Swiss-Prot record:
The keyword Transmembrane does not apply. It is found in: Secreted. Glycans are attached at residues 102, 252, 308, 395. It is an enzyme of class 3 (hydrolase). Keywords: Glycoprotein, Hydrolase, Protease, Secreted, Serine protease, Signal, Virulence, Zymogen. This is Subtilisin-like protease 4. The active site is at residues 160, 191, 346. Secreted subtilisin-like serine protease with keratinolytic activity that contributes to pathogenicity. Pfam families: Inhibitor_I9, Peptidase_S8. Its main location: secreted. GO terms for biological process: proteolysis. The lineage of its organism: Eukaryota, Fungi, Dikarya, Ascomycota, Pezizomycotina. The gene is SUB4.
Length: 399
C-alpha cells in the first residue's frame, strides 16, 4: 500500500523539478563566456503583465542578495520583446540565478557570450567582382545587370559596428537606428559601413535604392555580446512594426559566436515577423551548425565564395548553409569616404541581404525568400564542403 503522505511529497518534488527552467550550455570550445551575465527567456504565452511582475520580482531579489552578500553584480540590464518572445539580460549572483531558474514562467537561461564580426580586412583599392558574378550564370563578367527598381521602398537593417550614414555611397538613404554596444554613434571599425555599402550602396551595392538603418551592436574592436545583438534585433522588429514595413524589410548580421538558443530564437522571430534575415556562416572553416545565428534554421545562412567559384578557404560550411555568395576581396565603402577591400563571410552575407531587398522590391515574400533565392541560384561552387550546397547567389537577370 502506498503512503499518501509520501506520495504527495514525491509529486510535489516532481512538479517543482518539472517547473524548473533549463540552463542551456551553449557555444563551442572556443566560445568566450561573459562571467555572471545571463539571458533569460520566458515561456511562450507569458503575458506582458506577468513578465513585468517577474522582472520586478527579480530586481527585488537581486537587490536583497546584493545587500546581504556584498556582491558587485549590476542586476537587470535590458529587456526584450520580439513579437511576444519575451526575455531579459542581467548581471546576477548565483543565488539570484537560482531564484530565476525556479520560476515556472521561465523557459530557459543561458550565459551571455562574446560575438564577433565575420570579416577579415585585406588591402585597399582592389577591384570588386561580386556584383557582376551574382547577375551572370557564368563567371568573368564585370557588368552588373539588374532591375532599376533596385530595392526601392525596402529597408535594410545593418546589425553591425555602426554605419557612416553620411558616406557618399548612401546618397542620403541611411539613418541611425540604435546603439546597444557603447555610447559612440559612429562606425569606428569600418565593418558595418562596408557591409551596408555591399547590400545597398549606390556604387558598390546590390539594392541601390533601398533605405538603410544603422543598428550598432559591436564596438570598435569588432566584438559585442549575444545580449547586445538580441537587443539590436528587438529594435529592428519594433521599428519595422511601428513604421508599418514588416514585409518590406531585410536584416543583415555579418557576425557570429558560439551556439546560442536565445540568439537563434531572436532571429527566428524576426524572420517570422516579415523581415528577411541574412547571416554570415562564420570564418573558421568549420561546421556552421556550432555557430549562432548561423545555425538558426529559419534564416538565410551564407557561405563565402572566391572569384573562381571555389569555397573561400576560411568559410564555414555544413548542412545549415543555404547559399554561397561572393566574399573574398570585396570592395565597398569605408568610414570617412572612399573604399576598402575586405574578405569574409561578412562580405558574402550582405550580398544576400541586398538581394533579398531587391527581390522584396519586386514583390517577393520575405518569409519564403531564402527558398526562392536557392531556386534561382547557380550550381557553381567547387568543393563546397561536406554536406554543403554548391549553389551560388544569382539575381535572375537572364544573363
Amino acid at each position: 500500500m502506498v503512503c499518501l503522505k509520501t506520495l504527495s511529497v514525491f509529486l510535489a518534488a516532481f512538479a517543482a523539478a518539472d517547473a524548473r527552467a533549463v540552463f542551456k550550455t551553449q557555444g563551442h570550445k572556443n566560445s568566450e563566456m561573459i562571467p555572471d551575465n545571463y539571458i533569460v527567456v520566458m515561456k511562450d504565452g507569458v503575458s506582458q503583465d506577468d513578465f513585468k511582475a517577474h522582472v520586478s520580482s527579480v530586481a527585488s531579489i537581486h537587490s536583497t542578495n546584493k545587500a546581504k552578500r556584498g556582491t558587485n553584480t549590476e542586476g537587470m540590464k535590458r529587456e526584450f520583446d520580439i513579437m511576444n518572445w519575451r526575455g531579459y539580460h542581467g548581471h546576477f549572483d548565483r543565488d539570484t540565478l537560482e531564484e530565476i531558474l525556479n520560476d515556472s514562467k521561465v523557459d530557459y537561461v543561458e550565459q551571455d557570450q562574446v560575438v564577433r564580426i565575420s570579416g577579415l580586412v585585406t588591402q585597399r583599392g582592389a577591384p570588386s567582382w561580386g556584383l557582376g558574378r551574382v547577375s551572370h550564370r557564368q563567371a568573368g563578367s564585370r557588368d552588373y545587370v539588374f532591375d532599376d527598381s533596385a530595392g526601392r521602398g525596402v529597408t535594410i537593417y545593418g546589425v553591425d559596428t555602426g554605419i557612416d550614414i553620411n558616406h557618399q555611397d548612401f546618397r542620403g538613404r541611411a539613418r541611425w537606428g540604435t546603439n546597444t554596444a557603447d555610447r559612440d554613434n559612429a562606425d569606428r571599425h569600418g565593418h558595418g559601413t562596408h557591409t551596408a555599402s555591399t547590400f545597398a550602396g549606390t556604387a558598390y551595392g546590390i539594392a541601390k535604392n533601398a533605405n538603410i538603418v544603422a543598428v550598432k551592436v559591436l564596438g570598435s574592436d569588432g566584438s559585442g555580446s549575444t545580449s547586445g545583438i538580441i537587443a539590436g534585433i528587438n529594435y529592428c522588429v519594433q521599428d519595422a512594426q511601428q513604421r508599418g514595413i514588416l514585409g518590406k524589410a531585410a536584416m543583415n548580421l555579418s557576425l557570429g559566436g558560439g551556439f546560442s538558443q536565445a540568439n537563434n530564437d531572436a532571429v527566428t522571430r524576426a524572420q517570422n515577423a516579415g523581415i528577411f534575415v541574412a547571416v554570415a556562416a562564420g570564418n573558421d572553416n568549420r561546421d556552421a551548425r556550432n555557430y549562432s545565428p548561423a545555425s538558426a534554421p529559419a534564416v538565410c545562412t551564407v557561405a563565402s565564395s572566391t572569384i573562381n567559384d571555389s569555397k573561400s578557404s576560411f568559410s564555414n560550411w555544413g548542412p545549415v548553409v543555404d547559399i554561397y555568395a561572393p566574399g573574398s576581396d570585396i570592395i565597398a565603402a569605408r568610414p570617412g569616404g572612399g573604399s576598402t577591400t575586405m574578405s569574409g563571410t561578412s562580405m558574402a552575407s550582405p550580398h544576400v541581404a541586398g538581394m533579398g531587398a531587391y527581390m522584396i522590391g519586386l514583390g517577393a515574400d520575405p518569409r519564403s525568400l531564402c527558398d526562392r533565392l536557392k531556386q534561382l541560384a547557380t550550381p557553381a561552387i567547387r568543393n563546397p564542403g561536406s554536406s554543403t550546397t554548391n549553389r551560388l547567389l544569382y539575381n535572375g537577370s537572364g544573363q
